[in-house]
Amino acid sequence: MMHDALFERFSARLKAQVGPEVYASWFARLKLHTVSKSVVRFTVPTTFLKSWINNRYMDLITSLVQSEDPDVLKVEILVRSASRPVRPAQTEERAQPVQEVGAAPRNKSFIPSQSATAPAAQPMAAQATLRQGGSGPLFGSPLDTRFTFDTFVEGSSNRVALAAAKTIAEAGAGAVRFNPLFIHAGVGLGKTHLLQAIANAAIDSPRNPRVVYLTAEYFMWRFATAIRDNDALTLKDTLRNIDLLVIDDMQFLQGKMIQHEFCHLLNMLLDSAKQVVVAADRAPWELESLDPRVRSRLQGGMAIEIEGPDYDMRYEMLNRRMGSARQDDPSFEISDEILTHVAKSVTASGRELEGAFNQLMFRRSFEPNLSVDRVDELLSHLVGSGEAKRVRIEDIQRIVARHYNVSRQELVSNRRTRVIVKPRQIAMYLAKMLTPRSFPEIGRRFGGRDHTTVLHAVRKIEDLISGDTKLGHEVELLKRLINENNA
């Protein structure tokens, strides 16, 4: 296998999947390091960029490499400074998924770094999306100007979350009933877009609030470097003097000391009526690695789930992407037949739709007459081969809760009323029947219960079903609803 040819093909496919802006921001400095019989290693200039790619893009990178060479079993990301001397120019490079901003009167200035040097210039493709105007020192990755409420596709699955987000951006501290706002959803369903839209709108509001937007990973990195540099107090003072904290990917917040500091910050902001917005890939009560005090405080506000987009939303996303592509190339055209087909076929998330569109846009340059059959062939990795998606415990909880007119939070709570206990036991039973999860893991997903509680619930529902035809029909109906949800 020609290594250079492999990397060129891989890079082209990766750019088609993630889009040119994302590629320029996160993968422009990715280099092929070594290729052995079963392991491919890439290098990046910083530890943080390695962590970012590992957490967000490793599955995609691995699948693309394996599609080029099926013998590859493993893909690794290394830091170049760990494998060879770092040149001076490289030591200034940083890739940090964060935007920190604070607004002075009519001048949107950014809160400067407390413990790090300024980052190197952003790639040209990324510069096009930076906030323009009278901004002060820029630190880390800027807010993406494309992520606004106007560009967010609204539908039945995200309407409540969007309404809450707009209320916070417009009302600020007046939106106390949404404090903290916790948005949870699977990968690619719009959490980051919505959080950045809140930050963008807040900065542009006449209230001139001081806003900090960051990821949980970046929060950990900033505190670690501040502690290392004996500058933690300065960082804490900076964060305490803000009006709006927006933090993404809360599921990645790790470490006892870091969580302790975050808990203090969260308590201080909420007690001072400062707005906090958090997003994660699961509900706050399912974040088992979080300190119970943090989890409890996050549960004290408004938790809203964003579900997968329906057909109308998917079609609108593709239409908007088409409009954006035509701004760059007025002659660009993909037939409505193909757009409709893709909207019906690629159903998992907006991110997969974006990948599908980028793939079609890339292919169109040398295959101008794409047919529906050819599109199916190109997007087979997104459309799937007819296999059902893995059932998630949170899907079971949501469907059971809806069926019995209770909330998911009640299912995982300590309440033991009859109206809650029966649905909870049925949900535990279905979790054991429909997922590969163990009794202890199911117990953790139901509010940290012991595995014996789950075992008791499973045995009890089995016994009841054998003598209660009505309950048996209810459970079969729930199974069908869950399987249809994952079809």
Curated annotation (Swiss-Prot):
Subunit structure comment from the entry: Oligomerizes as a right-handed, spiral filament on DNA at oriC.
Region named Domain III, AAA+ region: 142-364
Family, as annotated: Belongs to the DnaA family.
Sequence segments annotated as region (Domain IV, binds dsDNA): 365-487
Protein name: Chromosomal replication initiator protein DnaA
InterPro entries: AAA+_ATPase (IPR003593), Chromosome_initiator_DnaA (IPR001957), Chromosome_initiator_DnaA-like (IPR020591), Chromosome_initiator_DnaA_CS (IPR018312), DnaA_C (IPR013159), DnaA_dom (IPR013317), DnaA_N_dom (IPR024633), DnaA_N_sf (IPR038454)
GO molecular function, one term: ATP hydrolysis activity
Domain I, interacts with DnaA modulators: annotated segments: 1-71
Binding positions (ATP): 188, 190-192
Protein's cellular compartments: Cytoplasm
Domain II: annotated segments: 71-141
Organism: Agrobacterium fabrum (strain C58 / ATCC 33970) (Agrobacterium tumefaciens (strain C58))
UniProt-listed PANTHER family: CHROMOSOMAL REPLICATION INITIATOR PROTEIN DNAA (PTHR30050:SF2)
NCBIfam families: DnaA
Keywords from the named record: ATP-binding, Cytoplasm, DNA replication, DNA-binding, Lipid-binding, Nucleotide-binding
Domain notes: Domain I is involved in oligomerization and binding regulators, domain II is flexibile and of varying length in different bacteria, domain III forms the AAA+ region, while domain IV binds dsDNA.
Protein role: Plays an essential role in the initiation and regulation of chromosomal replication. ATP-DnaA binds to the origin of replication (oriC) to initiate formation of the DNA replication initiation complex once per cell cycle. Binds the DnaA box (a 9 base pair repeat at the origin) and separates the double-stranded (ds)DNA. Forms a right-handed helical filament on oriC DNA; dsDNA binds to the exterior of the filament while single-stranded (ss)DNA is stabiized in the filament's interior.
GO cellular component: cytoplasm; plasma membrane
GO BP terms: DNA replication initiation; regulation of DNA replication
